[in-house]
């Protein structure tokens, strides 16, 4: 059984060779796509393309609960979430990697929990991301010579539209990067006692910067980011220990009413 799961985009296929496809039926419907099982550097992993095999799910329609539940059903204990983000700060440049340490939720109508009754849970999200995996991927990015930020606050918006300029100026007062897919993925993983790390890749500056978007430049940055993520996964995943020493699963002891 795979103990590591990856949720991301098509760039993962550059480093991941699927060996088996598993259709998982969950109480929350079907995942974005059948789960693909394969190996990265000899480590068995499970992969779900977040937006579907053909990018058919916009951010607000991704079946987040089904995705996380499916990975848990297959034995996954650690989830690596890969996201593309815009920058809210000058120093977070296109092409940079951010190992997110906090998030702010500005989504509006997603399925946020597995516990809608009769059982009720209040999960602690003070430190939402696995410290063990954050350290591994930050240090690996440094070793590879990639521009990386050890911390960053991710503001997650509903989408699929982008922010207005007024919203962007507001968000940059308290966050570093902006995207549409981190929530509720991260809190659902926490509710099931799973470790979660977010590897965010900066594609461009958000609208606050008032810089014209050059489509060719964005595509170039995205291709470079895919390469960096692939190298990070190749070098970082083998460093993840078999046993968890992070305490991420401890929340299960205190979250139920």
UniProtKB/Swiss-Prot annotation:
Keyword Phosphoprotein assigned: no
Site entry: Important for substrate specificity: 163, 215
UniProt: substrate binding residues: 180, 204-206
Keyword Transferase: yes
Pathways involved: Amino-acid biosynthesis; L-methionine biosynthesis via salvage pathway; S-methyl-5-thio-alpha-D-ribose 1-phosphate from S-methyl-5'-thioadenosine (phosphorylase route): step 1/1
Catalysed transformations (reactions): S-methyl-5'-thioadenosine + phosphate = 5-(methylsulfanyl)-alpha-D-ribose 1-phosphate + adenine; adenosine + phosphate = alpha-D-ribose 1-phosphate + adenine
Keywords from the named record: Glycosyltransferase, Purine salvage, Transferase
GO terms for biological process, alphabetical: L-methionine salvage from methylthioadenosine; purine ribonucleoside salvage
Phenotype on disruption: Disruption of the gene results in a large decrease in ribose 1,5-bisphosphate generation from adenosine.
Known EC number: 2.4.2.28
InterPro entries attached to this UniProt entry: MTAP (IPR010044), Nucleoside_phosphorylase_d (IPR000845), Nucleoside_phosphorylase_sf (IPR035994), Purine_phosphorylase-2_CS (IPR018099)
Protein family according to the UniProt entry: Belongs to the PNP/MTAP phosphorylase family. MTAP subfamily.
PANTHER family linked to this entry: S-METHYL-5'-THIOADENOSINE PHOSPHORYLASE (PTHR42679:SF3)
NCBIfam families associated with the record: MTAP, PRK08564.1
Protein known as: S-methyl-5'-thioadenosine phosphorylase
